[in-house]
Amino acid sequence: AFAMGIGPEAVAAGLGAFEPVPGRGTRFVGKHLVVIDEAYNANPDSVRAAMNVLAGEAGPRTFILGDMGEIGDSAEEAHREAGEYARSLGIDALYACGPLSRHAAEAFGEGGRWFETRDALIEALKGLRGTATVKASHFMGFAAVVRALQDNEE
């Protein structure tokens, strides 16, 4: 920006006006829960990045994971590694929904829970407190999970 003659004030104003796109890291701060919405897309790298962010947040910290799509033959292993990685970061709980995400919940161990349906997951999240990240590939429809968490806080 500076090379193009844009001054620091204009850069600061532009950055200050930035609003994240829903599903791409937006935050909702409720009375008892902070929701980090990462529900638009998921792959192994972006899941680890989202877990790294959550690990630095106030607890209890819950990672809500839906299936990662389009990752080929390594899908089960990638989900299992996600659960192991979340555990290694000290994340308090991992809630999962989707046939592949079941491997993440199992690998997470104690505090890992798997739900067969999105509705069952949403029901289990009622009363959740602390900080929660919602991460899934778009086809999982986890924007509904984000909305439910927000509605529970209003």
Predicted regions: what they are:
Residues 1-154:
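ATP-dependent carboxylate-amine ligase
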